[in-house]
Each structure stands twice: as C-alpha cells, then as structure tokens.
C-alpha cells in the first residue's frame, strides 16, 4: 500500500477527500487514513475498512411467461435474478437482497396502457415499474402475482413484460441498475386468448345413407391465436370410436384431426383413421366436431352430422313373365 496526500478543508478539524479512478470490478480494497499536524506529530496507523468495487450490472430474467407464448389466462410473472458478479467470490458480491430490488412492468400492445398494480393507466406511461418480491441474495427467484384478471383482462391482446434488478452496491443505494432488456430474457411478449376456434363438418353430408366411410373432413377457423385441430366424437349409439376400436357407450372418447395449416386463422381438417366395420346395417352414425386453437381453447358446443350405415344390397324379382318359355304380345308390360 502507498500513503498519498489528500485534500483537507478545515483548521484544527475539518474534512478530507480523495478522488480515485481505475477501479477493478470485483476487487477488494482497504482504505486507511492518518493525520499529521503542523508540529509533525503523526497519528498511529490503524487499519481502515475493507470494501469491494462492484461495477457489474445485475440481471433479472423472466421464466414465465416465455416469449411469444399463448395463455388462456394472465399468468403470474416469475423469473430469476442475480447481481451480475459472475465468477467473483461470494464475499465480493453486493447481492440484490431486498424485495424492492426486482421490478417488473406490464404494457398492453393494443393501446399502450400500463398496469399499475391493480388497474390500467393511460399511455404514455411505459415502463411503469412495480416491485416484485425477490427471495435470495446474490441470486434467487422473484414473482409477481397481482396480474390483470376479471374485467381488467381482455382476450385477443398481446402484452409486453419487462423485468429489471438493482444490486446493493454503495454509495448510491440501491446500487447498480439493470438498463438492458434482451428479448427472450428480460423482455417477453405473450398473448391471452380465451376464445375458442370453431369447426364444421363438410363431409359426409348430414342425413345421408352410406355403405362405408373412409374419410371425414371439414373446416376450422380462429380469430386470434390460430387453429390447432378438430376434436371428433364418432359414435353409433351403442359405442364410441377411439381410433383403434369401438368402446362401450359408457366410455365416451374423442379423436383428433390436425389442421392442415396449424396456426393460421382459417384451415381445413380431415380424419382417415376410421373403422372398416360400422356394426350392423341400419346403424345411425353420429360425428361431432369441436374446434381447438393453439392456446388449447376448445369449442364448447359441437356441430354434428348423422348418416345411416346400410351395407345390405336391395333385392328385385320378376313377376311377369312368370316362367320360362312363355309368349307375350309387346303390348303386355313386364313387371313384378
């Protein structure tokens, strides 16, 4: 260590200061001071306090919701945070510690309004930072649960969520502040969609008769998150089709037909894994369909068609002439 002269203001007492540059991040330093009077009397050496220079930026990351994800409700916000010390020894980490040292901000992407921990406030307002309780020291987890719900939650809206952290490095408490928000880490956009897709059956036609069916198909549409699949229930009144066989009527089951263009607003679907045996001739087959979107919203009310399974060939008989070898005038019709 080296003793250097410092600036002193006063007479028999006063204050001193010394400006230093070139600090090294994570390094521990000791500062000691001693005084000398005009008579050359010098204070005995006494070790001063040890401190650590922390210039690394803390980081808060969002683990829920993930970027570009879809939800049927507004999820509680969750994430991690660390003080950015990296490989520095524990004793040199300033830590985050306080619950007020992780914050989050929520903004609607349709009208720019910001969440104010209980209500939406008008734009311009972003970012409106809200404290998110943090558990840990130099690293840990944070949560924020007072998210929009009820009348404050609209379907078909995209939301931006930010997170930031502060450490406890002195003298500027609460210390170093995160000022970078990488997409997918500290800045995520997600959407809430509570409205289901809708599906319809275009084949087979309702109230028709068939001796077989090798494909059923239809359309599916969704207004926001996009279509996923059609949910089918195929039954005969005595059993349900599960994709591999018929189940007893007490076991209602469904099969799924993937949309031809997953994620689009409008598409088609088809299902070919149908039974080769539809049971006894005369059975009435019912096909119900419901639409499902990529957020897993499923249509509440199914649309249905019914068709009659008939594999019995018709029979015809000749009544006139009644026997082989007879002779008839052309004026006499042949009939049964």
Describe the role of every protein-language-model region.
Residues 1-336:
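Low-complexity, disordered linker/stalk regions enriched in Pro/Thr/Ser/Gly
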């Amino acid at each position: 260590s080296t003793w250097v002269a410092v600036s002193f203001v006063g007479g028999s007492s006063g204050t001193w200061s010394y400006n230093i540059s070139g600090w090294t991040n994570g390094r521990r330093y000791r500062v000691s001071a001693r005084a000398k009077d005009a008579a050359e009397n010098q204070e005995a050496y006494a070790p001063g306090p040890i401190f650590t220079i922390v210039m690394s930026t803390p980081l808060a990351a969002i683990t829920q919701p993930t970027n570009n994800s879809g939800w049927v409700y507004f999820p509680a916000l969750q994430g991690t945070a660390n003080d950015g010390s990296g490989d520095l020894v524990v004793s040199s980490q300033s830590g985050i510690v306080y619950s007020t040292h992780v914050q989050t901000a929520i903004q609607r992407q349709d009208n720019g309004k910001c969440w104010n921990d209980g209500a939406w406030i008008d734009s311009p307002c972003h970012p409106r930072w809200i404290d998110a309780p943090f558990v840990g020291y130099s690293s840990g987890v944070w949560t924020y649960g007072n998210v929009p719900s009820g009348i404050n939650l609209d379907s078909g809206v995209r939301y931006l969520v930010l997170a930031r952290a502060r450490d406890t490095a002195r003298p500027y408490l609460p210390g170093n502040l995160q000022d970078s928000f990488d997409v997918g880490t500290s800045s995520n956009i997600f959407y809430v969609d509570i409205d289901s897709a809708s599906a319809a059956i275009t084949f087979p036609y309702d109230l028709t008769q068939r001796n077989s069916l090798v494909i059923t198909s239809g359309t599916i549409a969704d207004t926001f998150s996009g279509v996923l699949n059609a949910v089918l229930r195929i039954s005969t009144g005595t059993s349900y089709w599960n994709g591999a066989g018929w189940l007893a009527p007490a076991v209602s089951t469904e099969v799924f037909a993937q949309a031809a263009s997953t994620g689009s607003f409008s598409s088609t679907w088809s299902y070919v894994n149908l039974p080769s045996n539809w049971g006894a001739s005369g059975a009435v087959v019912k096909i119900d369909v419901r639409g499902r979107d990529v957020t897993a919203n499923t249509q509440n009310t199914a649309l249905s068609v019914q068709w009659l399974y008939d594999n019995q060939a018709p029979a015809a008989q000749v009544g006139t002439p009644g026997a082989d070898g007879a002779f008839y005038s052309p004026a006499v019709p042949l009939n049964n």
